[in-house]
Swiss-Prot record:
GO terms for biological process: chromosome segregation; DNA recombination; establishment of integrated proviral latency; symbiont entry into host cell; viral genome integration into host DNA. Residues 3-176 form the Tyr recombinase domain. Belongs to the 'phage' integrase family. This is Probable integrase/recombinase YoeC. It comes from Bacillus subtilis (strain 168).
Amino acid sequence: MHIVQPIRSLEKIQEVKQYLLNKNKRDYFLFIFGINSALRISDILPLQVKDVQNKDHLWATESKTKKKRKILILESLKQEIYEYTKDMKENEYLFKSVRTRKPISRIQAYRILREAAAACGLEEIGTHTLRKTFGYHFYQRTKDIAELQRILNHSSPSITMRYIGIDEDTTRAAYKVFGGL
């Protein structure tokens, strides 16, 4: 099983953003949307313009849990949504394939992110990195694990901490302090 990590460094996030912005508008928006929405890639890819344009929130039926959830759209993301969708039709998919006009596949999304990660010197990156990155930075800024647990729809705080890589960070720091015998 391939374990993926959040992108912990804000500088690396900016580097990935710049790389994708220079490469492809759709791919850049996929990254921006993913790290700012806390949605799974399987819930992001089928979204259409009408789901997000001029909205304060979106409704998503989670593919994993089948629960319908109201997802707030961050103010910072609203401008990105406007810029990306202003010339699109409301029934267009946000992340459509140039060839089929249908949503890109999870495999294609994975390839996009892996290519950007490799170009920016990141390892252990996959589609789940987007959601984990949201969680990691939400926690770093708010320290509110209960709210993050609710946002991510996890059953316990310990699952959320492990999911966003905080357990690993804590263990690494403890080993560093210990230093050895």
